[in-house]
Amino acid sequence: MTEKRKGEGDKLLYCSFCGKSQHEVRKLIAGPSVYICDECVELCNDIIREEIREISPKRDGSELPTPHEIRAHLDDYVIGQEYAKKVLAVAVYNHYKRLRNSSEAGGVELGKSNILLIGPTGSGKTLLAETLARLLDVPFTMADATTLTEAGYVGEDVENIIQKLLQKCDYDVEKAQRGIVYIDEIDKISRKSDNPSITRDVSGEGVQQALLKLIEGTIASVPPQGGRKHPQQEFLQVDTSKILFICGGAFAGLDKVIEQRSVKGTGIGFGADVKSKNARATLSENFAKVEPEDLIKYGLIPEFIGRLPVVATLTELDEAALIQILKEPKNALTKQYAALFDLEGVELEFRDDALNAIAHKAMERKTGARGLRSIVEAVLLDTMYDLPSLEGVSKVVIDETVIKGDSAPLMIYENPESQAAVSE
């Protein structure tokens, strides 16, 4: 029964599915002689969503982009770093080809190609990893190696990395096993000295040891939701051998280690090949010559380096590259701020000399591409503060003098009279 007599002439309506009265639910929707409540509608939605997810076709190998297509996609978002893009494109293509065709490898077990990115701050390491995950439509998570400690110590366990990945895909284990994990600041967990210490290094070599199995491939037991607060819950079993791990770091000081190895054996005394300060290799040139022995000397243990067979080095960005980054990528900084101003109905123009000045300032700060946003944000702060309160502004122009702090941005008004009043 969907209705019952409450009193004379009054009808109390009930949900035809769960039997709850109209007073027990938020909304009761009427149909031809039937009613359904909002709770039952929500339950039906959940059931349909679950069924669609189960029957949705899996991506097959034919959808995997080729290395050329991967590289082309990276070009849309990342300026420069041609060698790193090529290395990443091949490594990622081989990794996912291995996953999709593991049964057809003719009994040959294909090895895992985890990646180590070495490059200065702001050179695009994180952006490359994020762009890859977006292209491949796979779960992606970032972890900071500096927060990791061995199990049992204050800090994050390495298993938390997999838990973060699961959270990104609503704890769908199958989906998580095809994901990408980017571990940043990997150079910060290098061994504190060349000689093993008696005291325990829980945030350096200890973390490297803990990451070994995870990166190589193991069955990680991860609590579903709530972690250790709900020990009665069954743990999820995640096979990390299918997850692509990309580790990145600035490796400050590694160039000196490489240089020491390169000049070793050049002799001493009158016959020595002494290089002048100007003749020394640049940071990018040194990074390009990196060998596993250099990383071991830097503080990474040999077993850990062995788990990261693909090494891609990124070059320092020069002023010309920073100018390109400001205006060329699909999500370029100038395009982002132009879109932001467009929401106010105002056109934003950056003149070429302004872009040169921004890039020059970022080079002086030695922050790479990462420092560009803070410079632009500081320059536009007052304008973004005042603009919503001003009427009739049609365009804002930024030139070199604005970046240097010698003048305010030029505001152009729709009405010439308003422009004249402001000038006065």
From Swiss-Prot:
GO terms for cellular component: HslUV protease complex. Residues 3-56 form the ClpX-type ZB domain. Keywords: ATP-binding, Chaperone, Metal-binding, Nucleotide-binding, Zinc. ATP binds at P120, T121, G122, S123, G124, K125, T126, L127. One of its GO terms (biological process) is cell division. Zn(2+) binds at C15, C18, C37, C40. InterPro entries: AAA+_ATPase (IPR003593), ATP-dep_Clp_protease_ClpX (IPR050052), ATPase_AAA_core (IPR003959), Clp_ATPase_C (IPR019489), Clp_protease_ATP-bd_su_ClpX (IPR004487), ClpX_bact (IPR046425), P-loop_NTPase (IPR027417), Znf_CppX_C4 (IPR010603). GO terms for molecular function: ATP binding; ATP hydrolysis activity; ATP-dependent protein folding chaperone; protein dimerization activity; unfolded protein binding; zinc ion binding. The keyword Acyltransferase does not apply. Gene3D superfamilies: 1.10.8.60, ClpX chaperone, C4-type zinc finger domain, P-loop containing nucleotide triphosphate hydrolases. Component of the ClpX-ClpP complex. Forms a hexameric ring that, in the presence of ATP, binds to fourteen ClpP subunits assembled into a disk-like structure with a central cavity, resembling the structure of eukaryotic proteasomes. ATP-dependent specificity component of the Clp protease. It directs the protease to specific substrates. Can perform chaperone functions in the absence of ClpP. Belongs to the ClpX chaperone family. This is ATP-dependent Clp protease ATP-binding subunit ClpX. It comes from Aeromonas salmonicida (strain A449).
